[in-house]
Design a protein with these regions (language model features):
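DNA-contacting surface of Y-family translesion DNA polymerases
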Residues: 11, 192, 200-348, 360-366, ...
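Short histidine-centered catalytic/ligand-binding loop motif
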Residues: 120-122, 261-269, 313-322, 386, ...
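Gly/Gly-Pro- and Ser/Thr-rich, intrinsically disordered tail segments characteristic of DNA damage-repair
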Residues: 1-234, 247, 285, 376-380, ...
């Protein structure tokens, strides 16, 4: 049943008005369009397989404790009668349709995920319209045109709008007028504040602070002293419902990447290497498709115990080559002794590769061989010049270690990464492959599985690092 909660019948006042709209159990409800007979039953949407995690759960399944991100095996134990549906719906189609409806309301729409967005409705007053009525109209259109339920919050800022939409679920609308902000916030738990995680909640609890009202009673100096200047000011502002962040209509990606969950926990270095290579090639292709270069990389590893670590790899030369990314990632795993020889000492459940510090390709690196061919520049001259530029800049090394493994400086010029940047020319090769794929098909040309740069042993890498430090000391 739809619910509407508001502090007064009309809008949120004549100040800033932000709506947060969140689709209810989005993946589940898209699947129900094809399986309406399952409506009202506990449903779990997840990829089929022994290592799957829950993507979405119906409210009937949530009543049994099932949550998104939970291992499917655990979800089955909590809700044994739940129907498990694989990911098969056209989620992007429905997501685009929802965003199109929101863009009809206002030009200021910030999509934050496939099923939620912020909308700045402040301009409605200029046209004599009620922002709350517009929010309800959007929900009505989504229900009528797409047969999907949604929840929304309307408030003076993004923080409050997000909290209101969460509180209105399922299928509701909650309006927070400016004069009732503290009435809304004070009785709630500090963990209900958007952005306050488990660590901050635990710290506040140690001081006897459990509600937002209790946190609001603390002075700014008290909060800064215990949580640091930035976090202290953030907590102080949130307790008063202060959030000045604008609705960002065009969000430029700051990072991109992917993860791979092994079918069974693995200690096989070849299996890990194959996963890294596949992730890296996909990542490189994605970078090139949007004209971006990675200024840094990060690796994510999850052991069989669910212990999770990330590791940064700093780069002196931006990359968009999947083969270069794979080589640098594998080198980092060996240096940190995540991979030793042909084995992995601690069984891995998941591996991930991410590109960070993204920059436009035209800002970051020399002209590629393919570009020079397209523009009529002598390919041999272009290749020689770009190889020289690569040699002068050197290669990116590894950054912060996963654990107690060997540390590797960000300015290293040796190692497999440097050889690839200086002599492998993988970026040019992969740009040419992209062009062939666009003209013919993705199956027309593939890299040979064995085409990788020769890798250094960890001992050689450490020895070179020691020599480099001696040279720097002299």
């Amino acid at each position: 049943m739809e619910q509407t909660r508001t502090g007064k019948a009309s809008g949120a006042g004549n100040g800033r008005v932000i709506m947060h709209l969140d689709m209810d159990a989005f993946f589940v409800n898209v699947e129900l369009l094809e399986n309406p007979a399952l409506r009202g039953e506990p449903i779990i949407v997840a990829p089929l397989g022994p290592r799957s995690v829950v993507c979405s759960a119906s409210y009937e399944a949530r009543a049994h404790g099932v949550r998104s991100g939970m291992p499917l095996s655990r979800a089955r134990n909590l809700s044994p009668n739940a129907t498990v549906l694989p990911l098969r719906g056209d989620y992007r189609h429905y997501s685009r349709a929802v965003m199109a409806i929101l863009n009809d309301l206002s030009p200021y729409v910030e999509q934050v995920s496939v099923d939620e967005a912020f909308v700045d409705l402040t301009g409605a007053y200029l046209h004599g319209q009620d922002p709350v009525a517009l929010a309800q109209r959007a929900r009505d259109r989504i229900a009528q045109e797409l047969s999907l339920p949604s929840s929304a919050g309307v408030a003076p800022n993004k923080l409050l709008a997000k909290m209101a939409s969460t509180g209105s679920k399922p299928n509701g609308l909650w309006v927070i007028p400016p004069e009732r902000v503290q009435e809304f916030l004070d009785p709630r738990k500090v963990s209900d504040l958007w952005g306050v995680g488990a660590k901050s909640t635990e710290q506040l609890s140690r001081y006897g602070i459990h509600t937002i009202a209790q946190m609001r009673s603390m002075s700014l100096d008290w909060l800064k002293e215990r949580f640091g200047a930035a976090q202290g000011e953030h907590l102080w502002a949130m307790a008063r419902g202060i959030d000045e962040r604008p609705v960002i209509t065009e969000r430029e990606e700051k990072s991109m990447g992917g993860e791979h969950t092994f079918e069974t926990d693995t200690t096989d270095a070849q299996e890990v290497s194959a996963a890294i290579r596949e992730l890296s090639l996909k990542l490189g292709k994605r970078l090139r498709s949007v004209g971006k270069l990675a200024g840094g990389l990060s690796l994510k590893i999850r052991y069989s115990t669910f212990e999770t670590h990330t590791r940064a790899i700093a780069l002196n030369v931006p990359v968009d080559s999947g083969m270069q990314i794979a080589s640098l990632a594998l080198e980092a795993l060996r240096v940190d002794e995540i991979v030793v020889g042909q084995t992995v000492p601690r069984a891995l459940r998941l591996i991930g590769v991410r590109a960070e510090k993204l920059a436009r390709a035209e800002d970051g690196v020399q002209q590629t061989l393919f570009d020079s061919i397209q523009s009529g520049v002598n390919p041999r001259s272009a290749q020689t010049a770009s190889a020289t530029a690569s040699t002068q800049r050197g290669s990116g090394g590894a950054g912060k270690s996963f654990g107690n493994g060997v540390r590797s400086g960000s300015g290293a010029r040796s190692g497999s990464g440097a050889r690839l940047v200086k002599s492998g020319r993988w970026s040019e090769v992969e740009h040419v492959m992209d062009a062939i794929h666009r003209r013919y098909s993705s199956e027309s040309l593939k890299p040979a599985s064995g085409v990788v740069a020769p890798e250094q042993k960890v001992e050689e890498r450490v020895e070179q690092k020691a020599e480099q430090k001696v040279e720097e000391g002299n």
